[in-house]
């Protein structure tokens, strides 16, 4: 949540997302150099995940431009497990306990109630962000299992997504805006980036 707050408080949310994710990419370079890439079995999932993570950054930035953090963040984070659960049941044949059904209903009702608190466009972008979160949750989990090494997997993921997102943001915003964002709050963006990559690594290891 800390890096989401730093992103929301920035003048340009997309550039802030790039800077924060870029910190994770830079921090991952020495790890990648020391350990090397993950096994080839994980590379396909890495390609999928890079695309999803970049889409996530774009959608989240747009959501924060259109609505408040108090709406966008819970909607995005609440939508993701809901979609993962529904997708697991409908597409993968997973079973769900009665208590899980109750949880799905409660989360769905809570998400619907959030529609009245912000703009409809912002709500839609927040839901799309949740879809991307669900997507990379599934693809990264599969990639880690395929490569059997979460640290090497996430090192390559963060380096690649930084490279791709840098190209996208450079074309959309320009180098001047990117440099200005880094100069404006270097310490906060650095701490947010390091916190984000550490938290996500712990999630994948767990």
Region annotations inferred by a language model:
Residues 1-51, 57-67, 116-127, 159-205:
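Membrane-interface interhelical linkers
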Residues 16-17, 72, 153:
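Juxtamembrane helix-start motifs in multi-pass secondary transporters
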Residues 19, 48, 75-76, 99-102, ...:
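Hydrophobic core positions of alpha-helical segments in small-molecule transporters
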Residues 20, 24, 73-80, 129, ...:
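Structural signature of transmembrane alpha-helices in multi-pass secondary transporters
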Residues 22-28, 85-89, 96-115, 131:
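Hydrophobic transmembrane alpha-helices of multi-pass small-molecule transport proteins
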Residues 27-44, 87-99, 142-151, 205-206:
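Helix-coil boundary and interhelical linker segments in multi-pass alpha-helical membrane proteins
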Residues 60-99, 113:
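Membrane-interface helix-loop-helix junctions at boundaries between adjacent transmembrane segments
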Residues 121-145, 149-152:
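Selected transmembrane alpha-helices and immediately adjacent juxtamembrane segments
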């Amino acid at each position: 949540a800390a890096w989401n707050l730093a992103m929301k408080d920035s003048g340009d949310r997309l550039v802030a997302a790039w800077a924060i994710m870029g910190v994770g990419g830079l921090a991952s370079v020495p790890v990648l150099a020391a350990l090397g890439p993950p096994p080839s079995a994980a590379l396909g999932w890495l390609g999928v995940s890079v695309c999803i993570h970049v889409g996530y950054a774009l959608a989240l930035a747009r959501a924060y431009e259109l609505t408040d953090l108090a709406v966008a963040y819970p909607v995005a984070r609440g939508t993701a497990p809901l979609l993962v659960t529904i997708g697991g049941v409908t597409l993968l044949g997973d079973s769900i306990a009665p208590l899980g059904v109750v949880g799905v209903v409660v989360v769905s009702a809570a998400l619907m109630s959030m529609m009245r608190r912000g703009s409809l466009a912002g709500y839609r972008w927040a839901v799309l962000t949740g879809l991307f979160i669900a997507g990379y949750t599934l693809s990264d989990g599969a990639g880690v299992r395929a490569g059997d090494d979460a640290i090497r997997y996430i090192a390559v993921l963060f380096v690649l997504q930084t490279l791709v997102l840098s190209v996208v943001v450079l074309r959309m915003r320009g180098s001047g805006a990117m440099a200005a964002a880094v100069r404006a709050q270097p310490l906060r963006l650095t701490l947010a980036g390091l916190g984000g990559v550490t938290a996500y690594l712990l999630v994948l290891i767990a």
